[in-house]
């Protein structure tokens, strides 16, 4: 997207914690309009945006999607493991191509405290 910087919440930049590092298994993409679309833009872009989003769902790239109740813009749970792929998917959508949508990307992975339930051998931890 031209002149629109996406915000990235990168887990590698977060404070250290006592749990093992886990892989990124999904990415949450939180969209927000960069400016209100005009009625003309809505008529032109939205008939393309919905099928393009549905295509990504049918290709398995979008797992789930929602709309926020307090702001405009979609929230997508993406079945991708890299920020680069997530960004490319969102930028290819018509609203992204028009520069009307920016995204915050959050890398997600397995719940790390679950490691406390395992010993080094992968079994039960009797010290809990």
Model-derived regions, located:
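Conserved, structured core segments of small domains
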Residues: 2-128
């Amino acid at each position: 997207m031209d002149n629109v910087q996406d915000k990235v919440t990168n887990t590698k930049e977060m404070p250290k914690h006592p749990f093992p590092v886990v892989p990124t298994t999904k990415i949450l993409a939180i969209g927000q309009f960069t400016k209100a679309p005009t009625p003309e833009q809505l008529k032109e872009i939205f008939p393309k945006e919905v099928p393009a989003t549905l295509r990504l769902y049918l290709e398995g790239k979008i797992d789930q999607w929602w709309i926020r109740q307090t702001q405009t813009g979609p929230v997508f749970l993406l079945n991708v493991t890299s920020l680069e792929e997530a960004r490319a998917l969102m930028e290819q959508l018509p609203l992204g191509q028009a520069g009307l949508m920016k995204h915050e990307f959050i890398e997600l992975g397995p719940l790390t405290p679950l490691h406390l339930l395992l010993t080094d051998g992968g079994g039960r931890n009797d010290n809990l």
